[in-house]
Amino acid sequence: MLGNHISVAELTNVSKHGFWILLGDEELHLPFEHFPWFKAATIEQISAFEWPSEGRLYWPMLDIDLSVDSIRHPERFPLVSRHGRHS
């Protein structure tokens, strides 16, 4: 089928600080500091992700959908919960 996205996407490493994924020839780091909802996830849950389109990733076991740009530039996407912080 024309237009299908078929590049390789895989989990390459997990540490206590975050994890790395390979999208085609680009490796991206997702630090738990910026993506805290992955911190309690199992390796199985983190590694079971889909790359349905060039700009989107989806973790069905966790029901997490992320823009690839939010991983490349987390400072542009304030995703970290501010619960408990005082102004």
Tell what function each PLM region has.
Residues 1-87:
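Motif-centric detector for short Cys/His coordination patterns
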